[in-house]
Amino acid sequence: MARPALAASLEAVLGDRGNANRVFEILELLAAKEEEDVLCAARTCRRLFAALLRRGELFAGSLPAEEDALRGNYSAEEKYKIWMRHRYNDCVESLSELLGHDSFQVKESSLCTLMKFVELEAECPLVAEQWKGSIAFPRHLLKVVVNGLIPIHEDASLLISRFQEYMEYEDVRYFVMKVVTESIGQVMQKIKERPLPFYQQNVFSLISPINMPNKERDMVKFMMKQDNREEWKVSKLQAHKQAFERMWLTFLKHQLPSGLYKKVLVILHDSILPYMNEPTLMIDFLTVAYGVGGAISLLALNGLFILIHQHNLEYPDFYKKLYSLLDPSIYHVKYRARFFHLADLFLSSSHLPAYLVAAFIKRLSRLALTAPPEALLMVIPFICNLFRRHPACKVLMHRPNGPQDLSEDPYIMEQEEPSESRALESSLWELQSLQNHYHPDVAQAAAILNQSLSEIEDDISGLLELSASELFDKEIKKTSANVPLEFEQVRGLFGKKNDIIAEHFALD
């Protein structure tokens, strides 16, 4: 079994420098076929090089080649440290390859071993500070780890979730963001803007859970311990925001798989925009996302809406783009509830021009003619709320001098520009026709337009996700009253009062 042999090799290498060559016995087992042998070798490497790092027996600084060290003017002590540093690098290379192993246990063990080396190199640096304010953080080693977490041809989400505990360290998180930014630029440039589904999903899995601090005083957990921390660039919240912003902008400037657009847009307002120095730089990504169509276009508009109202973005085509999303499918798609929830938010301002709101009311009404009952029970109160917010649009509810023939309706359904649709000149004959709908609840809801609307808006939150099955269940649970067939209750065949048959016949 490999375990006793590994223990003996470990004890020999740490006990006597004359046994240094036995380190190869440990490194060779990292390439073993048996999973248990590989796991034992990884644990042994962790113990071996952790001890050597703490004892200062690895060469620190710019590492010369092995051949140069043998021929150069180095002491025996320096030659040993240089040689062992090369074996340490061999170990790191083997462990990085094991991050792509078929066994998750091997991947996890390799990841934990490499991150232990990162922690120890942060404690006992093998590189010197490059300039004042910089730190001798093992960035190269961390880059090896990150590149192993974001492979191009396989899903690494499970291993990434195991790595997330290390992202709680401020310095680790900072350098991960820097490394990811570099990786995206290098990888995406090679494939000439084609989507890489596995790679981009892995990158998203790695960066989307990043929990940025809100204040600089909250940044207290560092893997690398330093006394003059206030001089670090890594300890500055502004530096973290810059790295965070650059990372996301680099990731989002490339074409994404369609499913990934939705995932990004869902977390955009909570997890990305609040931590950017210039949130309006997301305008290019949101414009591209709008062009994808469907629910992604809607979520992109939500991002634009946030930029307009919270970050003073000028975007005059916002409502035109929202208006263009209104088509017959909007009452049938599975994201209908989200659409009308956001549309209600977008149209909540009472300062919108009447012609714009009228265009939305009219198009929603026209599309309602072919909508299912469950959608109609939601959209009719939705339209009524728009009337309450914008009383100037109530001319649509009652226009006695309007055209008598529907073909003369001035509203131009095909017009993409709301201001040119002539909606304010029209009337809501569509909703009047719904008063004759086959479903009694729809007919009753549409009849409210014949009355004076109250000032209190209807709460449509409970209607947004109303389904056909819910309507059906509601109907079959109704208890029908007894239907009266006669004014007087019958008491027998000839029991009626003034019954002519009873006067002339008798049953004997």
UniProtKB/Swiss-Prot annotation:
Name the family the entry cites: Belongs to the CBF/MAK21 family.
Its main localization is nucleus
GO CC terms in record = Noc4p-Nop14p complex; nuclear membrane; nucleolus; small-subunit processome
User: What is the protein named?
Assistant: Nucleolar complex protein 4 homolog
Q: Where in the cell is it found?
A: Nucleus membrane; Nucleus, Nucleolus
Q: Transmembrane region positions?
A: 288-308, 341-361, 367-387
The alphabetized UniProt keywords are: Membrane, Nucleus, Transmembrane, Transmembrane helix
| Organism this protein belongs to | Gallus gallus
Q: Name one GO biological process term.
A: ribosome biogenesis
* InterPro entries in alphabetical order: ARM-type_fold, CCAAT-binding_factor, Noc4
Q: How does it sit in the membrane?
A: Multi-pass membrane protein
Q: Name the Pfam families for this protein.
A: CBF
